[in-house]
Amino acid sequence: MKAARLQVIGTVAGLIGVWAMTAGGCANEQQKRGQELYAHYCMHCHGESGRQNEGFNWSSMPDPKPKDLSNKSEMGTFKDEDIFNTISRDMKDTSPGGDKIGDDDFAVPTMPTFKYTLSEDEIWSIVGYVRTLHGMKLEFKVEERKKELAEGLKTAQEKFESSKQAYEAAEKKASEEAEKKSAELKKDVDVDESAYAKEQAAMAQAKKELDAAQVTLNNFSGRPGKGGNVARPDMTATPDQAAQMAEVGKRLYQNKYGCNGCHSIAGEGGKVGPALDRAGFRLNATWVYRWIKNPQAMKPETRMPALGLSDADAKAVSMYLSTLRAPKAEEPAAAKPAS
């Protein structure tokens, strides 16, 4: 009996050990992936250890500079969700008269969003790695989040099927009533669409919710911009229209999308991406539009994130870049040989 009890205890202990190793392995894998993503997308500004003035681009960036991610006294005040939301927010126009910015909104244009570049799971991996830079661990239950999304999709599917059945039943009833009246009056009677309008609206709403739930679940594991080609835009505009768009684009370039955090003009700005002084000579406006709408569709491993530009914003920024036509830098004069 005692031997049997010991065998059971040993089996349970073994299972717990396997579970712990599996959980630990998942955590280690997540941290490793987060470190790789951080190195690719974040290190040039935030530095290898998250310290200020450590990344090669840090000193070139306009104020406010990137936070010290190694500072536990400050970073410890943020929840995991706060860090996630900072990395995956929508960009805000910080210009006077621009977007409304709430007290809790993070609105630093030079910190890009990765909402349209990385999967939700990948962003959580980055959050987990950032936590290690100030000696903390990710507390957010990522796997539970995935299960919730799967359950949400299942619920949305059931709701859609139910609303579809209700719509079809109401439409059938209205059609049968119209046929009955046609037979009685011996003339065609139109179906009363208002009789099933409520069910039709409910079905349409349920379909929207189903589509949204499907996209959210897809984006949890898959990158949102992968494989999404951008259609060629119509960039035709009168000179006055082009000038107005370029003026808007100049504002968006700096105050909404923070392009100056990575690119320089006239020596001012970041040095992650190429200088844009002569973009008007080097780059075609149509190509620029497609690139800034979805860089990953054109170059999957580029460090430049997709920032969620609307069509209008992408046209405006493209028009602004087309106006940048600085003269070529003069070649340094050859040194004269000593006489």
Describe each PLM feature range.
Residues 51, 258, 298:
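Conserved helix-loop functional segments at active or binding sites
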Residues 21-33, 43-74:
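Accessory recognition modules or surfaces
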Residues 29-48, 84, 126, 227-229, ...:
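Sequence/structural segment immediately N-terminal to covalent heme-attachment motifs in c-type
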Residues 47, 54-57, 96-98, 137-143, ...:
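Short, solvent-exposed loop/turn and secondary-structure capping segments
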Residues 1-30, 128-247, 318-339:
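Post-cleavage N-terminal segment of exported redox proteins
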Residues 59-131, 219-222, 261, 266, ...:
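Extracytoplasmic electron-transfer domains, predominantly the class I c-type cytochrome c fold
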Residues 15, 23, 72, 112-115, ...:
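Generic anion/oxyanion-binding catalytic loop in active/binding sites
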Residues 41-49, 91, 134-137, 296, ...:
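A generic secondary-structure signal for well-formed alpha-helical elements
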